[in-house]
C-alpha cells in the first residue's frame, strides 16, 4: 500500500509539471491550430537560465528565496521574449500557409533552440548546487518532501489562475472568442495578433516556471531535456483533448500517474525484464492508444475532419 501511495504522490507532482507544459501546447493549438513543437525547448531554456542564475548567486549573501525568485523571474523574461519573438518571426508569416509549413517550421525552431543552448551551455549536464535540503514527511508509509508539496500547490494555483483568467476577464473572453472563430472575432474588433502574442506570452511564462520546477525536482539541466519533456506534454494535451485548457490539466495529471505507476510496478509485472527506465515508453504508448481510439481526447469534441 505504501508503494502504491508513494507512486501516486510522485505521479501527481510529476503530472502537475506536465500539465503546466501541456497548457502551452493546448493554448496555441486552440488559437492557431498549430502544434508548437518548439515549446518543450522553451522550457529547456527556462531551466538552463534558472540554473545559470542559481549558480551565479550560490554561496553569496543573497537569501535562498530571493535566489529562486530571481532565477524564476529571469527564466520567465527570457522565455516570454523568445516565445513572442518566435511567434512574430517564424509563425505569423505562415498563418495562412498550408498546415504542413508551420509544423515543419516549429520542428526547425525546436532544433535551433537545442543547438543554440548547446553552444551557450555546452552539451554537458548542469547540476543544481545544493542551495537547500528539502524536509521529508511520512504519510501512511509514503514519503513526501516540502519541495514536492510546493511544486504541486504552485502548479495547481497557476493552473487555477489561468482557468479563472480565461473565463472571467475581458482578455480571456477575447482569447475564447478567437479560439472559436478568429475571423469573426477580428470583425468584432478583437486584435487577433495581440491575442496570439499574449497566448505565446502566457504559455512561455508557464513553461519557464515548469523548467524551474524540473531543475529543482531533478537537480539537473541539459540542452536536450526539452525534447522528451515536450513530447510527454504534447501527449498529455492530446490525452486531455488538445485545445481544451482543462483537458491539458487533466491529461497532465493522468499521464504523470500512469508514468509513475508504471515505473513502480513494471519490474514486478515483467518479472524483472523491464526496469523503471522504460517508463517513458508508457507515455508514448498512451499517445498511440488515444490517437487510435479517442483522437479528440478525454474532454475534446469529436470532429468529422480526418488528418
Where in this protein do the model-derived segments appear?
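Alpha-helical transmembrane segments within multi-pass membrane transporters and channels
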Residues: 61-109, 116, 250-255, 259, ...
Amino acid at each position: 500500500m505504501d508503494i502504491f501511495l508513494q507512486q501516486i504522490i510522485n505521479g501527481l507532482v510529476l503530472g502537475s509539471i506536465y500539465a503546466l507544459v501541456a497548457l502551452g501546447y493546448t493554448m496555441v493549438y486552440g488559437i492557431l491550430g498549430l502544434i508548437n513543437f518548439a515549446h518543450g525547448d522553451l522550457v529547456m531554456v527556462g531551466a538552463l537560465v534558472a540554473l545559470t542564475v542559481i549558480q551565479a548567486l550560490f554561496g553569496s549573501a543573497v537569501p535562498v528565496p530571493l535566489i529562486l525568485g530571481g532565477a524564476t523571474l529571469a527564466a520567465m523574461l527570457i522565455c516570454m521574449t523568445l516565445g513572442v519573438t518566435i511567434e512574430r518571426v517564424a509563425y505569423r508569416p505562415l498563418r495562412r500557409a498550408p498546415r504542413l509549413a508551420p509544423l515543419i517550421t516549429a520542428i526547425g525552431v525546436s532544433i535551433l533552440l537545442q543547438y543554440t543552448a548547446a553552444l551557450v551551455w555546452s552539451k554537458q549536464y548542469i547540476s543544481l548546487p545544493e542551495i537547500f535540503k528539502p524536509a521529508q514527511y511520512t504519510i501512511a508509509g509514503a514519503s513526501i518532501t516540502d519541495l514536492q508539496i510546493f511544486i504541486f500547490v504552485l502548479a495547481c494555483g497557476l493552473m487555477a489562475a489561468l482557468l479563472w483568467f480565461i473565463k472571467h476577464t475581458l482578455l480571456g473572453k477575447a482569447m475564447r472568442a478567437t479560439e472559436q472563430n478568429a475571423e469573426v472575432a477580428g470583425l468584432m474588433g478583437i486584435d487577433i495578433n495581440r491575442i496570439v502574442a499574449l497566448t505565446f506570452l502566457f504559455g512561455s511564462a508557464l513553461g519557464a516556471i515548469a523548467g524551474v520546477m524540473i531543475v529543482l525536482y531533478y537537480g539537473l539541466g541539459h540542452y536536450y531535456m526539452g525534447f522528451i519533456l515536450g513530447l510527454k506534454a504534447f501527449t498529455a494535451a492530446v490525452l486531455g483533448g488538445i485545445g481544451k485548457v482543462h483537458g491539458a490539466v487533466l491529461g497532465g495529471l493522468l499521464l504523470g500517474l500512469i508514468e509513475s505507476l508504471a515505473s513502480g510496478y513494471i519490474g514486478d509485472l515483467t518479472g524483472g525484464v523491464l526496469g523503471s527506465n522504460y517508463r517513458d515508453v508508457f507515455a508514448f504508448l498512451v499517445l498511440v492508444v488515444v490517437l487510435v481510439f479517442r483522437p479528440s481526447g478525454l474532454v475534446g469534441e469529436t470532429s468529422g475532419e480526418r488528418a
